[in-house]
UniProtKB/Swiss-Prot annotation:
Record-listed Zn(2+) binding positions: 56, 89, 92
GO molecular function, one term: cytidine deaminase activity
Cited PANTHER family: CYTIDINE DEAMINASE (PTHR11644:SF2)
Name of encoding gene: cdd
Name this polypeptide is given: Cytidine deaminase
Function: Recycles cytidine and 2-deoxycytidine for uridine and 2-deoxyuridine synthesis, respectively. Catalyzes the hydrolytic deamination of cytidine and 2-deoxycytidine to form, respectively, uridine and 2-deoxyuridine.
Keywords: Hydrolase, Metal-binding, Zinc
Chain residues that bind substrate: 45-47
Record EC number: 3.5.4.5
Length: 133
């Protein structure tokens, strides 16, 4: 298990939430993640008038991960605009699985949880036919 400074990640996530574009819900979300090379990447939610096109903060973290050099996510904190811990939605859990695997630690109000515990029996690379991998 990686040594994670959860307070630092929550603080970075709260700062990221300050940049959220949320004119419809007014519900700012920020996320921050520790990368396997020691970097911290952040993201915020960006709403769209066509609600289904809204981008979650966790997806923005994955974009930041790849636009700053790639790597694997080790730990992620997601918070609202006041710094209260939030859990990623199901869609985001699936996206995070691709970039951190089942061992990715997700901040939780009680204790950090493995993504594999939050998304059991997830669809993954092994579910694709071999010729598509």
């Amino acid at each position: 298990m990686p040594d994670v400074d959860w307070n630092m990640l929550r603080g970075n996530a709260t700062q990221a939430a300050a940049g959220a574009y949320v004119p419809y819900s007014r519900f700012a979300v920020g996320a921050a993640a520790l990368v396997d090379d020691g970097r911290v990447v952040t993201g915020c939610n960006v709403e769209n008038v066509s609600y289904g096109l809204t981008l979650c903060a966790e997806c923005a973290v994955v974009c930041a991960l790849h636009s700053t050099g790639g790597g694997r996510l080790l730990a992620l904190a997601c918070v609202d605009g006041h710094g209260s811990v939030l859990m990623p939605c199901g869609r985001c859990r699936q996206v995070l699985l691709e970039h951190g695997g089942s061992e990715l630690l997700i901040d939780h109000p009680v204790r950090p949880r493995r993504l594999g515990d939050l998304l059991p029996d997830a669809f993954g690379l092994d579910d694709l036919p071999r010729e598509r991998r």
